[in-house]
C-alpha cells in the first residue's frame, strides 16, 4: 500500500504510475489478480531471503493487506510454500494491540495498554520502531514518532514493568 512493487507486471494491484494501490482503494477492488499478488509476494520473499540470509518468522503486510479477501489466498500459498507458521490475521486468537501509535506511545500508555491484556497467554504489540535514515524520511511522514516508540519500548521504565509482571518477550518463531 506504499511505494513501488518489485515486479513491473501489476495490472490489477497497482496504479497508473506503477505504485501499489493505496489501502483505501485496494480494499474496495474486486478484480485483484491473485496470481499477480502471489508473484509479487514471492519476489519480495526472495529479496528478503537474499538480504537477510533467512526467511522471515511471520507474514504481516503493510496495513494488513495480506489478510484482505483479495489477497488472503496468495498469502496462504506463500506461507505454505516457504513453511512460515505464523501469518498475522485480524481475527486471530492472539490479542493484538494496534493503538500503540503516534501520540499514544508514551510510557503511561504502554503500561495501560499492557494491563488490559494481562489475562492473555499471547499478546502482539504492533509498533513502528525504526532508526531514521534519508530513505525513510523521504517515503514516510511517520518518522520521529518511530524514534519515540523505540525510546518508550527500550526505556528503563518499560523494562522494569515487564520484569515486574514477569512478561516473557518472544518472537514469532517461538509461537
Protein language model regions, located:
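Terminal accessory/targeting
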Residues: 1-52, 58, 66-175
